[in-house]
């Protein structure tokens, strides 16, 4: 199944994060914080402005992004994988390089 977000929505696959502390302690899944980085896997057509124009999104498929800890509260399971759906304005930055 393929997910096509609408308007200014973005679909993100969370990055896998190490579940070890700096001291080498392995954290159980419930104690580890969810990663706030991911890869954009789908983008909508753009934000519809008040005058009816559509503004293209600043992110594109394949971008590595950083988002806040409470962003992307909409999780969707697609082909056994949990994906986040969030508005573009919930993305804080694009990781370059």
From Swiss-Prot:
GO cellular component: cytoplasm
UniProt main location, coarse: cytoplasm
Keywords attached to this entry: Chaperone, Cytoplasm
Keyword Nucleotidyltransferase appears in the UniProt entry: no
Family annotation (NCBIfam families): PRK00364.1-1, PRK00364.1-2, PRK00364.2-2, PRK00364.2-4
UniProt function note: Together with the chaperonin GroEL, plays an essential role in assisting protein folding. The GroEL-GroES system forms a nano-cage that allows encapsulation of the non-native substrate proteins and provides a physical environment optimized to promote and accelerate protein folding. GroES binds to the apical surface of the GroEL ring, thereby capping the opening of the GroEL channel.
Family the UniProt entry places it in: Belongs to the GroES chaperonin family.
Name the record gives this protein: Co-chaperonin GroES
Organism per entry: Pseudomonas putida (strain ATCC 47054 / DSM 6125 / CFBP 8728 / NCIMB 11950 / KT2440)
């Amino acid at each position: 199944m393929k997910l096509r977000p609408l308007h200014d929505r973005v679909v993100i696959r969370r990055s896998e994060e190490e579940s070890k502390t700096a001291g080498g302690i392995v954290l159980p899944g419930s104690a580890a914080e969810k990663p706030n980085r991911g890869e954009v896997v789908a983008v909508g057509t753009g934000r519809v402005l008040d005058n009816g124009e559509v503004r293209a999104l600043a992110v594109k498929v394949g971008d590595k992004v950083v988002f806040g800890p409470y962003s992307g509260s909409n999780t969707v399971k697609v082909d056994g994988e949990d994906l986040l759906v969030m508005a573009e304005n919930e993305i804080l930055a694009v990781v370059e390089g």
